[in-house]
Amino acid sequence: MHGLLLAGLLALPMNVLAHPAEQHASNVLSRRGVDIESFRLPLKAKYMDSDAAAQKIQAMSFSKDDDYVSTATKLVKSTFPKSTFRVVDDHYIGTNGIGHVHFKQTAHGLDIDNSDFNVNIGRDGKVFSFGNSFFTGEIPKENPMVKRAFSDPVKALKGAVKALNLPVKSDNAKAKTTAGKESFEFMGTTGALSAPKANLVYLQKEDGTLALTWRVETDVGDNWLLTYVDAHNSETVHNVVDYVASAEFKVFAWGLNDPTEGNPTSIRDPWTDSSPYTWHSDGMTKYPTTRGNNAIAQDNPTGGSTYINNYRPQSPNLIFNYPWSPTATPPSSYKDFSITQLFYTTNRFHDLLYSFGFNEAAGNFQVNNGNKGGRGNDFAIVNAQDGSGTNNANFATPPDGSPGRMRMYNWTTARPNRDGCLEAGIVIHEYAHGLSNRLCGGPANSGCLNALESGGMGEGWGDFYATAIRLKPRDTKDTNYSMGAWAANNPKGIRAYLYSTNLQTNPYMYTSVNSLREVHQIGTVWATMLYDLMWALIEAHGGTYSANPVFRNGVPQDGRHLAMKLVMDGMALQPCNPNFVQARDAILDADRALTNSANKCTIWKAFAKRGLGYGAKYDARNRTGSNRLPPGC
């Protein structure tokens, strides 16, 4: 799927931040009276972990080919011999030696947009694991391209605008053919940040049938949407995907989450080998400002869509040393410091993730990929003090090759108001949306975390990385952490519970998800499990609180960084739109690929503690928990 995800930090209005029960998403769509949750389709993906895959392959008398893409293709053909499909052009080999290949099912030459197959090939060239959400029902016998009885794309655009109450003027819209089958771009519209687009695709419906739809793409700033409008009835919308997920320098150094944890210090040349051009060059041009290969940071007080000519601090000698005081007001009075801090945190996280394997081929955010794979020209556009909102943040993740966009807002929860850029955990949470959306389903598909449970895990991954990075040497497994506490001016933070290994402090279990209906609530459950997992690995391997992990044969040598690496590797292994059980299995498979399952029982025990143990089962309305361990543990 040509996808983009907009993820936000919060899902509740600020007047209820202190309440333990989070409310529905307070994004721009909901302010227009549109409930995007009502358009989410249920999870359909299946995942065959490495153990099950080995048995399956043996039963099929399946042999590998010389090329990992050919081996993966052979598996898809063997699994669905009557289906047609195409190889998505985003395959790569990760730093753990696993090859990742993605496929899209087709019908009559058109994509079935939510029908995906991902195959993971091991170092030995054999199938390691795989997952799929292929359509298994009856393909329509009639080729729609023969009679062409479907509506034109302009009607679909108008249908999307009307159904979602979008601020797009489409009265004079005209469709212009672009590259690709039944692919169009709209001229004569206003209100969108870029020209809306439409593609004719099939979509699996909840009732098990296919619908011919126009996938209408509209970027309206706070929402970057793929709206699936019925191709025979433009008033019917079957599904909506939102790409925006509601994340010398004088800065708060890496590891300091917010101003309560320390003071700004001067840091010289903080980049690592992950940024060979430094943070101020893209390999072609050197920039005396907060711009480089990985990110471009600026203020955006009007909340507008343009950025290239926005204000950013200039320093010919690259000394970004600006004043800040906790009593300074308004936030615009220290915008130089704010932009510098945002630029620093974004680049620092880029470099850490690169060391774990989120590199060019995996779809990271860089202008110049240096002939290392992937699609370039897609640094992260990061806006400080963005005027399009308050008390929140978001990150838009289009597919590889298009820039990500982060909007960081001011928070009106304290006097003086607080700047979200100064809470590193919020920036990290937002950037982690870019990570998970590029890895899950492949760099070319940003629509693989758009179901309720998978979207919840997207929020959970953001909280997990934000929390893992802020750990201090004095911390133990009994240390509890909040999320967003400084910005929200609330020591309990913005989640229902603190992140804690204590079941009394945080009672969330796998079956808690049965009663939750919002992605940030579900994400808190997932991040809680990952917090337990991290501490289990720290107890097994020790903890290091240095800024950069130490690797031996590609394996981080401490439990904290090992947890971050395994969680990230699991994202690339799991199927499009996974559930908790599949994501757990993918982390176990990630450990098998990286350490030959050296941490298998440690991982199982951590998940079993929260009811996601051996025998736990997924059902959208009645998940079954288990505290059991598998044989051998």
Curated annotation (Swiss-Prot):
GO terms for molecular function: metalloendopeptidase activity; zinc ion binding. Zn(2+) binds at H429, H433. Residues 1-18 form the signal peptide. Its cofactor is Zn(2+). PROSITE patterns: ZINC_PROTEASE. Its main location: secreted. GO terms for biological process: proteolysis. It is found in: Secreted. The active site is at E430. Glycans are attached at N410, N480, N622. It holds the Pfam family FTP. Its EC number is 3.4.24.-. Keywords: Glycoprotein, Hydrolase, Metal-binding, Metalloprotease, Protease, Secreted, Signal, Virulence, Zinc, Zymogen. Binds 1 zinc ion per subunit. Belongs to the peptidase M36 family. PANTHER family: EXTRACELLULAR METALLOPROTEINASE MEP. This is Extracellular metalloproteinase 3. The lineage of its organism: Eukaryota, Fungi, Dikarya, Ascomycota, Pezizomycotina.
